[in-house]
């Protein structure tokens, strides 16, 4: 199509070619142990949790965000219930 305006003689339609049909489904199967290994290799669900507590020296509010799994969050909670305390930047 060269020129100022396209004309019908410039357009060629090829109607006798049929597109090839391709199966997009994968028929590959994994061993069950291989699937379990892949599942175990994925990282545990990590989420951000906000922690709000008070400074052990002056009583100011201390806020922080931790990223961990639920099991680690429970351990952190147990530490706060025992002896772990936070100090604010002013008292540090």
Swiss-Prot record:
Matches recorded under InterPro entries: Papilloma_E7 (IPR000148)
Region (E7 terminal domain): 1-43
Post-translational modification: Highly phosphorylated.
Pfam families from the UniProt entry: E7 (PF00527)
Cellular localization per UniProt: Host cytoplasm; Host nucleus
Signal peptide boundaries: none
LXCXE motif, short sequence motif: residues: 24-28
Keywords on record: Activator, DNA-binding, Early protein, G1/S host cell cycle checkpoint dysregulation by virus, Host cytoplasm, Host nucleus, Host-virus interaction, Inhibition of host innate immune response by virus, Inhibition of host interferon signaling pathway by virus, Interferon antiviral system evasion, Metal-binding, Modulation of host cell cycle by virus, Oncogene, Transcription, Transcription regulation, Viral immunoevasion, Zinc, Zinc-finger
Any one cellular-component term (Gene Ontology): host cell nucleus
Motif residue range(s): Nuclear export signal: 73-81
Zinc finger (unnamed): 55-91
Annotated disulfide bonds: none
Biological processes annotated in GO: DNA-templated transcription; symbiont-mediated perturbation of host cell cycle G1/S transition checkpoint; symbiont-mediated suppression of host innate immune response; symbiont-mediated suppression of host type I interferon-mediated signaling pathway
Superkingdom of source: Viruses
One Gene Ontology term of the molecular function aspect: protein domain specific binding
Entry text on domains: The E7 terminal domain is an intrinsically disordered domain, whose flexibility and conformational transitions confer target adaptability to the oncoprotein. It allows adaptation to a variety of protein targets and exposes the PEST degradation sequence that regulates its turnover in the cell.
Annotated function: Plays a role in viral genome replication by driving entry of quiescent cells into the cell cycle. Stimulation of progression from G1 to S phase allows the virus to efficiently use the cellular DNA replicating machinery to achieve viral genome replication. E7 protein has both transforming and trans-activating activities. Induces the disassembly of the E2F1 transcription factor from RB1, with subsequent transcriptional activation of E2F1-regulated S-phase genes. Interferes with host histone deacetylation mediated by HDAC1 and HDAC2, leading to transcription activation.
Record note on quaternary structure: Homodimer. Homooligomer. Interacts with host RB1; this interaction induces dissociation of RB1-E2F1 complex thereby disrupting RB1 activity. Interacts with host EP300; this interaction represses EP300 transcriptional activity. Interacts with protein E2; this interaction inhibits E7 oncogenic activity. Interacts with host TMEM173/STING; this interaction impairs the ability of TMEM173/STING to sense cytosolic DNA and promote the production of type I interferon (IFN-alpha and IFN-beta).
UniProt similarity note: Belongs to the papillomaviridae E7 protein family.
HAMAP family: PPV_E7
Protein name: Protein E7
Gene transcribed to yield this protein: E7
